[in-house]
Amino acid sequence: MVWKITGPLQACQLLLVVLSLPQGRTSSVLTVNGRTENYILDTQHGVQASLECAVQNHTEDEELLWYREDGIVDLKNGNKINISSVCVSPINESDNGVRFTCKLQRDQTVSVTVVLNVTFPPLLSGNGFQTVEENSDVSLVCNVKSNPQAQMMWYKNNSALVLEKGRHQIHQTRESFQLSITKVKKSDNGTYSCIASSSLKMETMDFHLLVKDKVFVMPAEPIIAACVVVVLTMAFALFSRRKRIMKLCGKKNDPNSETAL
């Protein structure tokens, strides 16, 4: 259909017609804790975090969905329409970095995501007792979790560890702090302390290293070879002796060997 506008009166009539046309749904907007954009929520270990998702500009009831990472959150029936809340309590270190997303059920492209930033003091773990033989290699692995990230260091017998070039090596990742010692000596005996220091707290974990004498183990191959040689020698000796005895017995039984009278 072609609209032909010839004057102001016709323009007003056209505007009235357009306004009287059936209107679609108003574009709904979501907010989480009053915010319309994705954001990071700073929180602490051991507290409770509440997230409230609400629909704005809706002309009819809207159903809401909550996701934790990629898994849908099971909501009660009274906690789905227009306003929906989820509660994380108590928050622990495993919740750090977790995404919570509220979505409009009829149009899941409409969403708001909240990422938890959980601060907590250093948590240390590892094998606290190790026994190794002299001249072997050993690694002391200190597992660490911390937010904010902790500053790490190694101590030996309550003093800062002096690293020996070629024997000591330190390898650090976000979740581990490893001390490797090659060709350990008796002087490496002692208590090694993994120390983690953050703005929240300083934590220490002790690793006890015992270096024992190297046990000399005779290689199995030479022993087996020696046994085989002994057995073969004995067998050959017995065989030769048996052959000689049989010859002697044969001479005794031979009539031609008797002395003539």
From Swiss-Prot:
Query: Sorted alphabetically, which InterPro entries does this protein's record hold?
Result: Ig-like_dom (IPR007110), Ig-like_dom_sf (IPR036179), Ig-like_fold (IPR013783), Ig_I-set (IPR013098), Ig_sub (IPR003599), Ig_sub2 (IPR003598)
**Which residues does the entry place in the Cytoplasmic compartment?**
237-261
Q: Where in the cell is it found?
A: Cell membrane; Cytoplasm
Keyword vocabulary terms for this entry = Cell membrane, Cytoplasm, Disulfide bond, Glycoprotein, Immunoglobulin domain, Membrane, Repeat, Signal, Transmembrane, Transmembrane helix
Q: What is the name of this protein?
A: Transmembrane and immunoglobulin domain-containing protein 1
Positions bearing carbohydrate: N57, N82, N92, N117, N157, N189
Disulphide bonds annotated for this chain are C53-C102, C142-C194
Give the signal peptide, or none: 1-26
Pfam families cross-referenced by the UniProt entry = I-set (PF07679)
Q: Which residues cross the membrane?
A: 216-236
PANTHER family membership: IG-LIKE DOMAIN-CONTAINING PROTEIN, VASCULAR CELL ADHESION MOLECULE 1
Checking Gene3D superfamilies in the record gives: Immunoglobulins
Q: Which PROSITE patterns match?
A: IG_LIKE
Q: Species name for this entry?
A: Mus musculus (Mouse)
Q: How does it sit in the membrane?
A: Single-pass type I membrane protein
Summarize what the UniProt record says about post-translational modification.
N-glycosylated.
Q: What GO biological process terms are annotated to this protein in UniProt? A: brush border assembly; cell aggregation; cell migration; cell-cell adhesion; cell-cell junction organization; cellular response to hydroperoxide; intestinal epithelial cell maturation; intestinal epithelial cell migration
Q: Where is the Ig-like C2-type domain?
A: 27-113, 121-206
